[in-house]
């Protein structure tokens, strides 16, 4: 393996370190080392993701008003999701020959602006008209980033759960209101970072508790009020008098509980059942480095918001998972995927593909947009297996020999994610605005 290397990255011309194990991973998946630091690699993927925005805009096909994750001012074409998923149009009709006299990204940009995008990122959903970034779900309203859920309102990042409202990052739970980072909880109100608990109110960092109110840091306890043990009868009388069904009383109890929480030390990180990890909000993870909001991850680095189960052997992977392996510098991809590089919104069952956007149930794609159930395609054109395997290495070399330079002077060769200026979403509508906030003038 190569020794540790300190590199100057091209976005801000400062230094970042590439460790020997990083080089081993890059060699394994056959990509050159990155020229951007981890934070900027995350930033440029965030520019392609909008989490909680839906817009009323005309369908690019017939002008019918539709709800879409892409606003009316976006430069891309947008079809209503039901039509986009149908067989009434063919993304292969937009195919084009690869032109070795022009940069790859320039050609890809033209294809991206030509092929219609789906109005929303949903898959196998029922009664989820006012939801986005959802799969295998039913009855969602103004909720986003959910998989295997039912009866969800005003919530974000929910997995394998039912009857959830006003909650964030909720896993394998039922009947949860106003929750934050809870796992395997039932009948939970106002709880934060709790797991394996039943009938709890305003609890924080509690595991295996039942019938507790306003408690912090308890393990395997029952009938406690602000960390004080009481009898079952005393607890039931307290709950009856608390009247948390009243909004005014709810706010009063919530504020009192928050004040009580402040008396206790805060753990250095949130997470359970981890081995050899660094980051925060990690659960059931092993050998995970500098990653955040990951569930069931193994051998990961620089990964964020992989909360839907099982992600392995991946770097710079942002959002989704649900059985993913060997993913690099990609976002919003998941559900039985493997060996994806520089991809966006590719799901489900995608593999062995690079520089693909909005593709599903496909393999061996390079520089494709909107394909489903295809393989051995380049710029949406079909090739034989032999033709594909002969042409792709030539394109990668061409990307090195004739790189794309954006308006800011940043150079994009093979091994870089899509240029930031290609994003079809305005900056203030993206996830980047949440983490790297800019004013309107900026």
Task: Annotate the PLM regions.
Residues 2-442:
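Long, distal/terminal scaffolding or interaction modules
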């Amino acid at each position: 393996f190569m020794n540790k290397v300190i590199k100057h990255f091209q976005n801000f011309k400062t230094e970042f370190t590439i460790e020997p194990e990083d080089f081993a991973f890059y060699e394994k998946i056959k990509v050159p080392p990155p020229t951007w630091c981890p934070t900027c690699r995350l930033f440029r993927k965030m520019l392609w993701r909008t989490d909680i925005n839906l817009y009323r805009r005309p369908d690019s096909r017939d002008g019918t008003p539709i709800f879409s994750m892409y606003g009316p001012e976006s430069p891309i074409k947008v079809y209503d999701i039901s039509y986009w998923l149908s067989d009434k149009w063919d993304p292969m009709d937009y195919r084009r020959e690869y032109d070795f006299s022009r940069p790859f990204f320039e050609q890809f940009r033209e294809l991206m602006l030509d092929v219609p995008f789906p109005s929303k990122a949903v898959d196998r959903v029922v009664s989820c008209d006012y939801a986005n970034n959802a799969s295998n779900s039913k009855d969602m309203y103004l909720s986003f980033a959910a998989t295997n859920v039912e009866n969800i309102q005003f919530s974000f990042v929910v997995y394998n759960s039912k009857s959830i409202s006003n909650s964030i990052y909720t896993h394998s739970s039922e009947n949860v209101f106003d929750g934050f980072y809870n796992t395997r909880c039932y009948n939970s109100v106002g709880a934060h970072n709790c797991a394996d608990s039943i009938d709890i109110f305003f609890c924080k960092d509690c595991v295996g508790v039942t019938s507790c109110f306003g408690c912090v840091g308890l393990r395997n306890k029952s009938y406690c009020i602000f960390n004080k043990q009481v009898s079952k009868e005393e607890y039931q009388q307290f709950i009856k008098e608390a009247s948390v069904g009243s909004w005014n009383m709810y706010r009063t109890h919530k504020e009192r509980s928050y004040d009580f929480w402040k008396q206790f030390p805060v753990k250095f990180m949130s997470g359970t059942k981890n081995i050899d990890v660094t980051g925060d909000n990690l659960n059931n993870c092993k050998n995970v480095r500098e990653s955040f909001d990951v569930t069931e991850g193994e051998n990961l680095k620089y990964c964020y918001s992989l909360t839907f189960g099982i992600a392995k052997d991946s770097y710079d992977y942002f959002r989704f998972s649900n059985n993913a392996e060997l993913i690099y510098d990609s976002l919003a991809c998941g559900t039985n995927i493997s060996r994806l590089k520089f991809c966006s919104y590719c799901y489900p069952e995608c593999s062995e593909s690079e520089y693909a956007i909005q593709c599903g149930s496909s393999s061996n794609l390079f520089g494709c947009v909107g394909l489903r159930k295809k393989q051995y395609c380049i710029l949406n054109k079909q090739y034989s297996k032999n033709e594909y395997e002969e042409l792709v290495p030539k394109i990668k070399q061409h990307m090195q020999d004739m790189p794309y330079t954006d308006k800011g002077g940043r150079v994009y060769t093979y091994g870089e994610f899509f240029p930031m200026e290609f994003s079809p979403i305005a900056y203030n509508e993206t996830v980047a605005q949440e983490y790297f906030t800019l004013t309107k003038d900026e």
